[in-house]
Curated annotation (Swiss-Prot):
Belongs to the peptidase S1 family. It comes from the Eukaryota. Residues 619-630 are annotated as: Zymogen activation region. Residues 93-165 form the Kringle domain. Residues 29-88 are annotated as: Disordered. This is Neurotrypsin. Its main location: secreted. It comes from Pan troglodytes. Coiled coil: none annotated. Residues 43-53 have a biased composition (Low complexity). GO terms for cellular component: axon; dendrite; plasma membrane; synaptic cleft; terminal bouton. Disulfide bonds join C93-C165, C109-C149, C138-C163, C195-C259, C208-C269, C239-C249, C305-C369, C318-C379, C349-C359, C412-C475, C425-C485, C455-C465, C525-C589, C538-C599, C569-C579, C619-C750, C661-C677, C765-C831, C794-C808, C821-C850. It is found in: Secreted. Residues 1-20 form the signal peptide.
Length: 875
């Protein structure tokens, strides 16, 4: 039965029995079972003011909502609204009803700042205006349709739905001012009241919090006789006092009977520290514990300017509102811009005051601010699982501490990842952050609460991450997690930023750029990728030094989606999100175009003079040797890890710098390679160039240099139809000892001793080059560990073709195949003398295919040619 039909039937006296209230509400107030109410006058839905006599004819038509008795003609309902002016808000629910955050079918709304780029279907127009808003209240951004919000459906997709804007809203009616009155609740299109049974100050405080009318509520009662015809919705409301709104309190659906003393619930919203303190409320937050600070002064509400606003000021605001927990200051209209006057400026509390009135500050109304500088606070309750950063210079940095069982404790850094840091900083209201060193902040003395934490990045709360049980760990306080969070824009405002990480670099300051979007890490296409884009990435990660862009999968190809293309940064943005001009996921790229960066880049070439003095007599040093990785069966080498590796390249009519062979730098002016490299194009010096300091063949690099060829010396015994004596020397153009400029990335290799047998002296051997990797020729320098094989095995495999001027190397098992292939011809086989330097024992020469089982690669044995090399080069 609809309400209109019910009222009409009531007026006509046609009801045989009275309908139960829950059948009208359709369980909209979390009441899922249904009743069949007994007949009779003891089960009223409306409480009449007096007994109605029998009617012989219908009365005149009545309005749908009865007016209050004549004794209250000047009194109006009171509810939260900007300045308490009863006008509709163009972006949301009617003024006074800002708390609706569920769809009309009960799905909880997502915060506007957490809506991903990919949606199940297109939402109503103009919603982009709400990007970055932290609340999840229903809104109508175009001002025309019904309010709506985004929600997550059962499949994990994001969809949107309309909201019943006033459902669950409350107001105060019949009081002397807006801070007192009878409590009325809105549901299913009707305002109703609450029976005062068990109504106490905790219940009243929730109403005051919901209406943002003060820090404390005093329970009152109002006779039903003065309310007119109005439904009763609830009885026995049982709030704890810290709920965000009355819908979250335990309560009983009214099922008829007698309400004790026939009294309705009412409240007076007061302030615990007396009338001399200004009235304060928090507005625009997602709960009663946070929001824009607003003061009631001279009959109107106004805001506070954030000049000198800090956590000490927030502490006083939280105390004055009766909100305990962690107090945090927010700046630059973090909770949205207010309206009305700016009441105060230059507030400078010590943190010990009982009220903002006791703090040093400007005079009322004196300021030089606009509403873009409105101050805010959050007062996070101390419940199990609350987190904070302690021991730093502010609430944005310090040891990560978790509150549990009345005590703060730390988190062990075992298995800690960037995603963990992202979840922590996001929960604290920051956009991104990074882990600080363990000794950056003072050690804690409390318990270690958590260990082995692992977050996926999708969590909205830290405790949603997988972890050990409380108190289970194998750590000391030297392993406490420390974090520095960074703002996401002006005033630490959280916006649509994306977590960023660098992958597959040689250290944490470089690598392939990956972004976390829609629950998945993906890469960035290098179309238009410049140093300005790199600067923004490095700034977002907290690095302040020079930044360099890298293209063409310089740090290897990524996996998963390519999230972003055509990034256009000016270099001044705070995060990647500010530079994205193209839809997420839209691109025309492959992973061979993945973008990378190097942060805090201070690379410099050594001068020619300093080289001659300090490095000319040194060979076989790897100045950047920090780690080993395991061409076919190989992996990317360490950049600068093989500084003697050079490449012989074609030029002029034969090709535009195409890679022909690998080679080894023996001195500033001499290079060692294979004789067969000149078999096809001849030995004209004009056809070739040598590139030193190269790592990625398609990306110009700081240490890279291309030098012309002055002389080519092929061993006189070499014959093109044979593989013996496959060795050659190349003289670079330039003055003696000043051809190639030495640096950390350009250094010579050592020659072996004459007739030295590397199988007995060398155990740690590597081949390097840009050759065949099984799919294609590599763009980045490869390296592979390779064992030297006994001479007799090579003689048995290759018969007379294998001579005493050769050696062979490689893994014999197919699943461990390591070999050098076409592109590595002429490149080095390097072995490390124990505790000494790296020696070029072989020059890649020939083999039966690439990585073929039981067919190891064959190398020219350099030790057999040492006298010839020295006679030509004068080394």
């Amino acid at each position: 039965m609809t309400l209109a039909r019910f009222v009409l039937a009531l007026m006509l006296g046609a009801l045989p029995e009275v309908v139960g209230f829950d059948s009208v509400l359709n369980d909209s107030l979390h009441h899922s079972h249904r009743h069949s109410p007994p007949p009779g006058p003891h089960y009223p839905y409306y409480l009449p003011t007096q007994q109605r006599p029998p009617r012989t004819r219908p009365p005149p038509p009545l309005p749908r909502f009865p007016r209050p008795p004549r004794a209250l003609p000047a009194q109006r309902p009171h509810a939260l609204q900007a300045g308490h002016t009863p006008r509709p808000h163009p972006w949301g629910c009617p003024a006074g009803e800002p708390w609706v955050s569920v769809t009309d079918f009960g799905a909880p709304c997502l915060r506007w700042a957490e809506v991903p780029p990919f949606l199940e279907r297109s939402p109503p127009a103009s919603w982009a205006q709400l990007r970055g808003q932290r609340h999840n209240f229903c809104r109508s951004p175009d001002g025309a349709g019904r309010p709506w919000c985004f929600y997550g459906d059962a499949r994990g997709k994001v969809d949107w739905g309309y909201c019943d804007c006033r459902h669950g809203s409350v107001r105060l009616r019949g009081g002397k001012n807006e801070f007192e009155g009878t409590v009325e609740v809105y549901a299913s299109g009707v305002w109703g009241t609450v029976c005062s049974s068990h109504w106490d100050d905790s219940d009243a405080s929730v109403i005051c919090h919901q209406l943002q009318l003060g820090g404390k509520g005093i329970a009152k009662q109002t006779p039903f006789s003065g309310l007119g015809l109005i439904p009763i919705y609830w009885s026995n409301v049982r709030c704890r006092g810290d709920e965000e709104n009355i819908l979250l309190c335990e309560k009983d659906i009214w099922q008829g009977g007698v309400c004790p003393q026939k009294m309705a619930a009412a409240v007076t919203c007061s302030f615990s520290h007396g009338p001399t303190f200004p009235i304060i409320r928090l507005a625009g937050g997602s709960s009663v514990h946070e929001g824009r600070v607003e003061l009631y002064h001279a009959g109107q509400w106004g805001t506070v300017c954030d000049d000198q606003w800090d956590d000490a000021d927030a502490e006083v605001i939280c105390r004055q509102l009766g909100l305990s927990g962690i107090a945090k200051a927010w700046h630059q209209a973090y909770f949205g811009e207010g309206s009305g006057p700016v009441m105060l400026d230059e507030v400078r509390c010590t943190g010990n005051e009982l009220s903002i009135e006791q703090c040093p500050k400007s005079s009322w109304g004196e300021h030089n601010c606009g509403h873009k500088e409105d101050a805010g606070v959050s007062c996070t309750p101390l419940t199990d699982g609350v987190i904070r950063l302690a021991g730093g210079k502010g609430s944005h940095e310090g040891r990560l501490e978790v509150y549990y069982r009345g005590q703060w404790g730390t988190v062990c850094d075992d298995g800690w990842t960037e995603l963990n840091t992202y979840v922590v900083c996001r929960q604290l209201g920051f956009k991104y952050g990074k882990q600080a060193s363990a000794n950056h902040f003072e050690e804690s003395t409390g318990p270690i609460w958590l260990d082995d934490v692992s977050c996926s990045g999708k969590e909205t709360r830290f405790l949603q991450c997988s972890r050990r049980q409380w108190g289970r760990h194998d750590c000391s306080h030297r392993e406490d997690v420390s974090i520095a969070c960074y703002p996401g824009g002006e005033g630490h405002r959280l916006s649509l930023g994306f977590p960023v990480r660098l992958v597959d670099g040689e250290n944490k300051k470089e690598g392939r750029v990956e972004v976390f979007i829609n629950g998945q890490w993906g890469t960035i296409c290098d179309d238009g990728w410049t140093d300005k884009d790199a600067a923004v990435i490095c700034r977002q990660l907290g690095y302040k030094g020079p930044a360099r862009a890298r293209t063409m999968a310089y740090f290897g190809e990524g996996k998963g989606p390519i999230h972003v293309d055509n990034v256009k940064c000016t270099g001044n943005e705070r995060s990647l999100a500010d530079c994205i001009k193209q839809d997420i996921g839209r691109h025309n790229c492959r992973h061979s175009e993945d973008a990378g960066v190097i942060c805090d880049y201070f690379g410099k070439k050594a001068s020619g003079n300093s080289n001659k003095e300090s490095l000319s007599s040194v060979c076989g040093l790897r100045l950047l040797h920090r780690r080993q990785k395991r061409i076919i069966g190989g992996k990317n080498s360490l950049r600068g890890g093989w500084p003697w590796q050079v490449s012989l390249r074609l030029k002029s009519s034969h090709g535009d710098g195409r890679l022909l062979c690998g080679a080894t730098l023996l001195s500033s002016c001499w290079v060692l390679t294979a004789a067969h490299c000149f078999k096809r194009y001849g030995n004209s010096t004009r056809s070739y160039a040598v590139r030193v300091g190269d790592y990625h063949t398609l990306v110009p690099e700081e240490f890279e240099e291309e030098i012309g060829v002055q002389q080519i010396v092929i061993h006189r015994e070499y014959r093109p139809d044979r593989s013996d004596y496959d060795i050659a020397l190349v003289r670079l153009q330039g003055p003696e000892e000043q051809c190639a400029r030495f640096s950390s990335h350009v250094l010579p290799a050592c020659l072996p001793l004459w007739r030295e047998r590397p199988q007995k002296t060398a155990s740690n051997c590597y081949i390097t080059g840009w050759g065949d990797t099984g799919r294609a020729y590599s763009r980045t320098l490869q390296q592979a560990a390779i064992p030297l094989l006994p001479k007799r095995f090579c003689e048995e495999r290759y018969k007379r073709r294998f001579t005493g001027r050769m050696l062979c190397a490689g893994n014999l098992h197919e699943h461990k195949r390591v070999d050098s292939c076409q592109g590595d011809s002429g490149g080095p086989l390097m072995c490390e003398r124990p505790g000494e330097s790296w020696v070029v024992y072989g020059v890649t020469s020939w083999g039966y295919g690439c990585g073929v089982k039981d067919s190891p690669g064959v190398y020219t044995k350099v030790s057999a040619f040492v006298p010839w090399i020295k006679s030509v080069t004068k080394l």
